[in-house]
Amino acid sequence: MQVTIEDQSLEAAAGEACGQVLSRAVSGKRLKNAVACLVDGQPRDLAFPLPEDAHELALVAADSPMGLSIIRHSAAHIMAEAVKTLFPSVQVTIGPAIENGFYYDFAYERPFTPDDLEAIEAEMQKSIAANQPFSCTYVPKADAKALFAAQGESYKLEIMDENIVGDTVSLYRHGTFTDLCRGPHVPTTGLVRAVKLLSVAGAYWRGDEKRPMLQRIYGTAFASAADLKTYLHHIEEAKKRDHRKLGAQLDLFSFSEEVGAGMCIWHPKGELIRTIIEDFERREHLRRGYDLVRGPLILRRELWERSGHYDNYRENMYFTEIDEQSYGIKPMNCLSHMLIYKSRVRSYRDLPQRYFELGVVHRHEKSGVLHGLLRVRQFTQDDAHILCRPDQLQEEITGVVRFVQDVVGLFGFDFEAELSTRPEKSIGSDEDWDRATKALVDAMESIGLPYEVNEGDGAFYGPKIDIKLKDALDRRWQCATIQCDFTLPERFDLVYTDADGERKRPVMLHRVILGAVERFLGVLIEHTAGALPTWLSPVQARILIVTDAQKEFAEQALARLKEAGIRVELDDRNEKLGFKVREAQVEKIPYMLVAGDKEKELGGLNVRLRSGENLGVKTLDEVALMITADCQEPFKRGGMRYNFCSQ
């Protein structure tokens, strides 16, 4: 039989190991760096027998995204073997590769400790040094159940009973460990060259709070020790930038068990930051032709039933009873916007209608996934819904994409765009999907925006563009979304009268720019390590006196800068200047303005930046102009205007 390898046609025999076939077509160095292969696009072990109907083979390199996922999956198996060796009574459950690492969940009588993790990692290194082969066998399900029953692995039995269809299962073995697994895996344990266990946490079996609590051990693995070292450095840097730590340090927000999980309490400085962002959003939306609207926090259950949320989303909603009627606390803002559109007769001349709301929403997130500002139960969403004619769709999408570019750039982020297309289960005609997808593509291409295609990952009601921010540690964060929707206009019977007098259905776009304001602020704090841009800093400048002799002059300078719209405060404590400077730097204040005898005599202030740079003595007018210009600079790129200095 003939197979194609990198545009070469090669003679091969059915049943021959795929790795053996590849060895005749690629260099030994590349083969040595391979961890698996693709058979007609499907990932397989290098030892996988070549099917007689195979057409194409390709290597999976260790440092490729797929290769790293396979290495991490194999590392999870190696970890499970180590845990079973050290703690024989443990039960194993599942151990997948995840983004940037892997985990395995174990049922054990007590939590694992940091000392346990060290011992487990040392045991893993023994297996890796032994270079044990991974082997795959296919056995009758009944035989596999007998094997795991004899080992007391009740979770594996449940998986086979509830999740595996068919009479045959695949088992992977290495060393003394056998696991139920689809694979693929690296050829030998020695190819897991760089591995590190990171942490342990509780996790409910199948994510169900009513099921047993398991012990989840997280780890990561890379193709090289250098890559692992870089990643571990990023983890340490991320700890320093943790928004929860910085939020407390900068006195921005807090969480309290007395209030409840996932509910943030905003302190004065944090609320000021929010207010500045929200005021900016309102003004920018008005400037770009949106109408500001507001809907109620709770709506009758019948509306959620009509929209489909009750059937598809109610587990994430909160409900309450009022006057013997059921109400849902809104998890999103769209329903009120539908009713605003429907409140009057619409002509084609009235379109587009753009409704914007900074709406507070509530979603019942599981307690195990709550994480500071990044995952909360109450948050504010910068929601907008655009209803337009089909011929206006591309222009509207282009406008939203440009809006996203301007706002993301203002906050200093780079970003990536991803197009999610029609899934297998969807509503709407082929014509609707083709038109909407083309409009999304044309909008991005018209402004030269690169994008990746995520086939089949659109919502059942329409395709979408997802914008993922790249932060200072090269992490990706989902924030902005532009979503076509064929469902709600139909369910709410939204129409307009066309030029020919016919009733037509408008096209609808859901979109958010920042997404959840809380989540965005959490990302921004970590991106900037708390050193927010000057325009957004709750305190933009602090005047520091050297002795009481400068206090009267400093108070005059304070009043002058406040008149100029600067958010400034005075530190007139009887402390050493160095202490005051360090404290201001810890608080991430952009400008430290020192008032000593020399500055008092000259009628100015010595300007120091939080970076440590000293700009020398400036007059009060120069200081005011400098800080104002610093605030205005980021806005110029998007043709926007800064006017939030005097909050």
From Swiss-Prot:
- Give the organism the record lists: Solidesulfovibrio magneticus (strain ATCC 700980 / DSM 13731 / RS-1) (Desulfovibrio magneticus)
**Highest lineage ranks of the organism?**
Bacteria, Pseudomonadati, Thermodesulfobacteriota, Desulfovibrionia, Desulfovibrionales
Alphabetically list the UniProt keywords: Aminoacyl-tRNA synthetase, ATP-binding, Cytoplasm, Ligase, Metal-binding, Nucleotide-binding, Protein biosynthesis, RNA-binding, tRNA-binding, Zinc
Q: Please list the cofactors this protein needs.
A: Zn(2+)
What is the similarity comment for this entry? Belongs to the class-II aminoacyl-tRNA synthetase family.
Where is the segment annotated Catalytic?
242-533
Gene Ontology cellular-component terms for this entry are: cytosol
- List, alphabetically, the Gene3D superfamilies matched: 3.30.54.20, Anticodon-binding domain, Bira Bifunctional Protein, Domain 2, Threonyl-trna Synthetase, Chain A, domain 2
In the record, what terms sit under GO molecular function? ATP binding; metal ion binding; threonine-tRNA ligase activity; tRNA binding
User: What's the gene?
Assistant: thrS
Where do the TM regions start and end? none
Keyword Zinc belongs to the record: yes
Q: What is its main location?
A: cytoplasm
| Subcellular compartments | Cytoplasm
Entry annotated with the keyword tRNA-binding: yes
The protein's name in its UniProt record = Threonine--tRNA ligase
User: Where's the TGS domain?
Assistant: 1-60
